[in-house]
Amino acid sequence: MKPKLKAIIIGAGGVTSYMLPALKNSFDLSLTIFDGDRLEKHNLDRQLFRNNQVGEYKARALMKLYNFRKDEGTAVSEYFTTDILDTEYKFFFSDCDVIISCVDNHPA
């Protein structure tokens, strides 16, 4: 039996696309991913997405790619800012075990 883990990942690009299979295989995972970016064709050479996912929000595309059921995870197609802590998404943070930052630029 795998240990339970409630995780939040901020950023759904290359690092997350490679890390997510290991997390899913290691834990009984409850996951929330925040990312407002859409997948672009130029992302495909360094991120584990499929051609038919171009144009989708990256957070949603990753949930589909790794077969997360609705009860296992949530994809939030918005950029994470501290303002999110004052929105309807704040409950995700109340009892999470770990927050993982996988952002790909300094402003993020």
Per-region residue spans from a language model:
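Adenine nucleotide-associated cytosolic modules
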Residues: M1-A108
